[in-house]
């Protein structure tokens, strides 16, 4: 069956939380803060693929969520960044927001557009260390990723 319209929910990945950690070694009784930062979440991208000619892939599956960023670790270890989620659409697709405004007109092969922005990773307690605050006992949580409903419409060009 030919599908020329789809409404899907996309959510970018949340940022990972920063770590609250202190250096501990045998002969270092009071090591300073060493909490690492959280990783960034993954973005949601739409990419034009010449192999597709309908929006059939989005007929039954409507929710697409990118992976979250990883938590920071001790010893200033940075959390893993979430991978971007790439959704393939046929050429001639028009992307519209919830209010009906056109976000993108995808025509050229391999053209990409970001439809949901990822959340930033939180900072660990090592990032808050200063001359006056030498042992910060707090860390940031990661920011949430953007989420939205979008409509995909396929412009059909008749060959005569």
How should each PLM-predicted stretch be described?
Residues 1-160:
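Conserved P-loop NTPase architecture
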């Amino acid at each position: 069956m030919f599908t020329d319209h789809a409404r899907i929910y996309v959510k970018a990945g949340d940022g990972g939380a920063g770590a609250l950690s202190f250096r501990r070694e045998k002969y270092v009784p009071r090591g300073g803060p060493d909490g690492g930062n959280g990783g960034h979440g993954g973005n949601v991208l739409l990419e034009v693929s010449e192999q597709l000619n309908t929006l059939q892939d989005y007929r039954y599956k409507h929710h697409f969520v990118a992976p979250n960023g990883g938590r920071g670790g001790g010893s200033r270890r940075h959390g893993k960044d979430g991978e971007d989620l790439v959704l393939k659409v046929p050429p001639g697709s028009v992307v519209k927001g919830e209010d009906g405004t056109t976000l993108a007109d995808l025509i050229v092969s391999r053209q990409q557009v970001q439809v949901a922005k990822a959340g930033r990773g939180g900072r660990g307690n090592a990032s808050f260390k200063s001359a006056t605050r030498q042992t910060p006992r707090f860390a940031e949580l990661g920011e949430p990723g953007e989420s939205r409903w979008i409509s995909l419409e396929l412009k059909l060009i008749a060959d005569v």
